[in-house]
Amino acid sequence: SGISGLSAAYYLSKKHHVDLFEREDHFGGHSHTIDIFFDEKKVSVDIGFIVFNFQTYPNLINFFKENDIQIEKSNMSFSVSVDNTNFEYCGKGLSGIFSNKSNLFNIEFLKMFFDIIKFYKKSDQLSISNEKITLGEYLKINKLSKTFVDYHIIPMVSAIWSMPPYEASRMPISFFLRFFQNHGLFKLKSRPQWYTVTNRSRTYVNKILSQISGEHYK
């Protein structure tokens, strides 16, 4: 019962009696909030669904408006830190990429930096084809540096889809291109504004559950 199941049950329950059966230990599927303690304070963290934007998620936005779900601005940030090295950066502007000043003199890092620019510009303009090649094969064809592959694009794909690196490299290139183009992730400037649910995603999960007519089993 992720957002698709819950929204379907929500609309059906307006005219019918609907019972929910959930095989997991929580309702909401990918929209799952947990509480952790940091510096002796409880912090609520979304571990699946986190951000959305107005361009790509119009139906979700309308659904939130209908249910008076409060939202707030967020960002789609990305950072990498390689264990036991000084190799780290974040993707928020040049100050983030070169937050570690030693990166300015790191040849491998500079290769990655220029590959990011080249790869993003080319991929954003590339027409989406039905070629049955993987992301890993696409990266090899374009002769991108190992540093770019291992410390940028594969970690980013792994983070977005919550998958190990070897699975990320097997992703169909057509799917990868479509997702990144639709979400503006190839844009070096003028990226879409991202939003998140105020007080985390369980806020809307609980509100929707309270409006579904029948019993809730899990």
Sequence positions of predicted segments:
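Glycine-rich Rossmann-fold phosphate-binding loop(s) that bind the pyrophosphate
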Residues: 1-2
